[in-house]
Amino acid sequence: MSKKLTFQEIILTLQQFWNDQGCMLMQAYDNEKGAGTMSPYTFLRAIGPEPWNAAYVEPSRRPADGRYGENPNRLYQHHQFQVVMKPSPSNVQELYLKSLELLGINPLEHDIRFVEDNWENPSTGSAGLGWEVWLDGMEITQFTYFQQVGGLQTGPVTSEVTYGLERLASYIQEVDSVYDIEWAPGVKYGEIFTQPEYEHSKYSFEISDQVMLLENFEKFEREAKRALEEGLVHPAYDYVLKCSHTFNLLDARGAVSVTERAGYITRIRNLARVVAKTFVAERKKLGFPLLDEETRIKLLAEED
């Protein structure tokens, strides 16, 4: 590798590359979530017949992974670069390898392996065939071909490529700690994120009000159901995301037992499934507007 890209240059390079492949560049969704997959730009758009090609950076919060800013590789919040393409192009893996070359990683000079790792997200009723991508022994990306999202079978098949930006940047810049990553010229990752990492870890593990969080979960669940009764998919899904993050905070605090944990996951999954079904129904009412006219008319005629 010649020039060592900064963190933001890595993002800009990936944005330009996937833009050139026909992806819309979306912005991070403004609700807490544990992974880029949970953004409505993936969760909702992966279902139904309409095409969808998008790429975006998604800050992902995992309270249980916080380490007070002291662990060089474990974070309360990390950043994913998410690419979702429906229908999946036949050469998506080749495209991915080309993107690595643009980041200065020559596949012919490195040990790049696709290790089978089928993916499942129980809290959203989602699963798919998947591979971890290992670069010289370190996982940097997750590949998934969605089979089910929100309890619904996907069709056409959606491919998802999720880059772990911190790991990728650590490798490209040859640093052992994420906090030593150069975010921009002269500015280190740690100078931006060490303090919030410490504070969020302290809050998640020591300070959070368990009673309040339990009450909030109940309120968010009720509000999601109320929105769904009115056919309001996106407000409902916002509250599903709030339920998920609230559960993650409770889990990090040790406030839920093993049995209770399974119950909370089931409640979130049940909501996510209703959201998914309602979304497809609402898109059908709109006539699946992202489909080309010929396909749209044919599909609507078949379903009627």
From Swiss-Prot:
The keyword Ligase applies. CDD domains: GlyRS_alpha_core. One of its GO terms (cellular component) is cytosol. Keywords: Aminoacyl-tRNA synthetase, ATP-binding, Cytoplasm, Ligase, Nucleotide-binding, Protein biosynthesis. Its EC number is 6.1.1.14. The keyword Cytoplasm applies. It is found in: Cytoplasm. GO terms for biological process: glycyl-tRNA aminoacylation. Pfam families: tRNA-synt_2e. SUPFAM superfamilies: Class II aaRS and biotin synthetases. One of its GO terms (molecular function) is ATP binding. Its main location: cytoplasm. It catalyses: tRNA(Gly) + glycine + ATP = glycyl-tRNA(Gly) + AMP + diphosphate. It comes from the Bacteria. Belongs to the class-II aminoacyl-tRNA synthetase family. Tetramer of two alpha and two beta subunits. This is Glycine--tRNA ligase alpha subunit. It comes from Streptococcus agalactiae serotype III (strain NEM316).
